[in-house]
Amino acid sequence: MMRSRPLLYLLALLVGVLSGCSAPYVQIGDFRDTEALQREELVQRGLSFLGSRNISDHNSVRRNDCSGFVVGVYRSLDFRVELEHYNTRFVADNLYRNLRSKGHVYYGMRPRKADLAFFRYTVPNGGNRVTHVGMVTEVENDDTVVIVHYSSQGVSLMRMNLQNPHEHRNESGEVINDFLRKKTPDTRPNSLLSGELFFMYGDLYRYLTD
């Protein structure tokens, strides 16, 4: 038994050295907590622009439009947003195509905070291209999605309920789908409300961090 003690000592020493050189164990939940905090920061930054029309004065926002707003929110928190340029005249459509190219667009699932909501047919002569984009701030108990976006009125909130896309208000009189397009002679049927014009969600956060 005395002869085995040096061997046991060497084994214990080796285990100690290897343990000291290994990286600290981090649970997956820690990463998720960090992501949740960053997503909340993005939402709060987006909400801080509410009521603003000229947002291009902020050094992270390059254009006073819907895509310039959402990209600027991410850039303001030091996310490096680099996008490929596709053959499309709508910047929101270009943003959508970038996310789609990496598999970060989805439909039919509950959106996460700071995810993007893409819309089509919000302007005349837009074809089937994405023409508008906003950022999800929360999902209410009735599945109404609250979105902060930049429009002709500046930065504001709109609501969208895909369970009842053709209803402007619910039975209690609360708005569940905001008007996103004005009615004109060439407006398609059922193409005025946010729920009617919604196309796809996009995860810009994961696109930038994966």
Q: How would you label these PLM feature ranges?
A:
Residues 1-9:
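Bacterial N-terminal signal peptides that target proteins for export
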